């Protein structure tokens, strides 16, 4: 019997989408003419692109080479000029670069459109949270919750032989899990520690399935827009899990009227953190939530279950050993980052292309897991959420400093639920 799932993912009045940041380091790719170019990956899961080391915007051409890009009709498209490192550019290339001098500004304008902006609503008037009160994510950040996880192979890329439901269940739930280098606990361990026990998740690995198309079908990008068929992957994976006997009704939460979140681990690397020449066709790890949505009645089964949000993350992560690029099971950092979005946290990193803006913003960087802290130790050791993020999620009380005296800050793991953090308000902002 075919099982049915109703998705409240697809006809939305308002949605929020968040993603892991692109890897922060430059890397080298071989061009169609045999030359090598050093680039940065930029953007996010909605709008991705590359830049040269001197900040010029690049886009993939039909031959998979990197070309200087221009914005036309709100789309980022490749010109006919193959890109090179600064020292290798010839006169015609330099002439075109001068002509494209506004491209970076145009890309930043595209990224400032409403669909790329993030709004974060606190549960009180000042944008902060209240201790013991959930944030406004797809998943409530207080209490016990069970989240279904599906492992997905593509038609042309299989999950590794060691990637079993038991293995991933251990990685996500086992106390003190440490199988891979730099691992110091499971995803559940992390959330119990960050919330000091206020949030107690169980990540139930419910199925291992194989979808009907190859990775490039679902991960296809179009004019800078990423992963245009990723929802097909989510629907198909859930249908296949239901056909295997997974009853999604058991994950419905009464106060939400749906399954709050389905998590998917897909085979191979992810677009955000891979340097493979075909990595544009990988899916960029991200989380998607429907907010104030209208349900369309679209059915793909007979369980009558709605799914409120999903996130997708990659199986493998890159690392370099002895100058050789290798891949191994991704650590929990990607999972933790995307699940942070499901709890209501936005990205903390700058997605634009202007180095001066990036330097001026001075985000938390490696000190925040919702920024590039998710790349610590090859994405195996998650950095703590910031005090603001824990306050927003209802896990930490902030004490406002109003008078001059001596204050002390203790390490996070010393004080337990009495952990102290301070807030200083700027009356002019």
Language-model features, listed with the residues they occupy:
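Terminal low-complexity, poorly structured segments
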Residues: 1-8, 90-92, 96, 106, ...
């Amino acid at each position: 019997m075919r099982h049915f799932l109703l998705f409240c993912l697809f006809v939305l009045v308002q949605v929020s989408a968040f993603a892991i940041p692109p890897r922060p380091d430059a890397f080298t790719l071989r061009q169609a003419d045999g030359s090598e170019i050093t680039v940065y990956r930029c953007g996010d899961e909605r709008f991705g692109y590359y830049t040269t080391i001197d900040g010029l915007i690049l886009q993939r051409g039909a031959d998979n080479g990197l070309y200087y890009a221009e914005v036309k009709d709100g789309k980022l498209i490749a010109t006919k000029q193959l890109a090179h490192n600064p020292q290798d550019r010839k006169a015609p290339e330099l002439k075109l670069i001068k002509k494209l001098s506004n491209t970076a500004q145009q890309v930043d304008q595209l990224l400032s459109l409403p669909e790329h902006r993030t709004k974060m609503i606190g549960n009180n008037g000042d944008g902060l949270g209240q201790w013991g009160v959930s944030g406004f994510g797809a998943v409530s950040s207080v209490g016990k919750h069970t989240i279904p996880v599906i492992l997905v192979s593509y038609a042309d890329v299989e999950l590794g032989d060691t990637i079993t439901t038991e293995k991933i269940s251990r990685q996500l739930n086992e106390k003190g899990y440490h199988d891979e280098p730099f691992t110091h606990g499971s995803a559940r361990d992390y959330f119990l520690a960050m919330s000091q026990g206020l949030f107690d998740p169980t990540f139930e690995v419910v199925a291992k399935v194989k979808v009907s198309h190859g990775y490039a079908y679902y991960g296809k990008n179009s004019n800078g827009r990423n992963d245009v068929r990723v929802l097909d992957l989510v629907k198909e994976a859930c249908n296949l899990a239901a056909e295997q006997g997974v009853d999604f009704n058991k994950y419905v939460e009464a106060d939400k009227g749906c399954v709050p979140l389905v998590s998917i681990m897909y085979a191979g690397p992810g677009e955000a953190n891979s340097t493979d020449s075909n990595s544009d066709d990988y899916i960029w790890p991200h989380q998607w939530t429907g907010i104030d949505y209208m349900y369309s009645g679209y059915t793909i089964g007979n369980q009558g279950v709605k799914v409120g949000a999903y996130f997708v993350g990659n199986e493998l992560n890159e690392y370099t050993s002895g100058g050789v690029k290798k891949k191994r099971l991704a650590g929990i950092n990607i999972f933790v980052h995307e699940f942070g979005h499901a709890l209501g946290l936005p990205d903390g990193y700058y997605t634009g292309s202007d180095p001066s803006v990036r330097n001026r913003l001075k985000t938390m960087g490696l000190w925040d897991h919702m920024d590039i802290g998710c790349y610590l130790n090859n994405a195996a050791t998650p950095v703590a959420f910031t005090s603001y993020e824990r306050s927003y999620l209802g896990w930490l009380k902030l004490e406002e400093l109003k008078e001059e005296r001596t204050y002390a800050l203790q390490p996070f793991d010393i004080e337990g639920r009495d952990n102290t953090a301070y807030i200083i308000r700027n009356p002019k902002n």
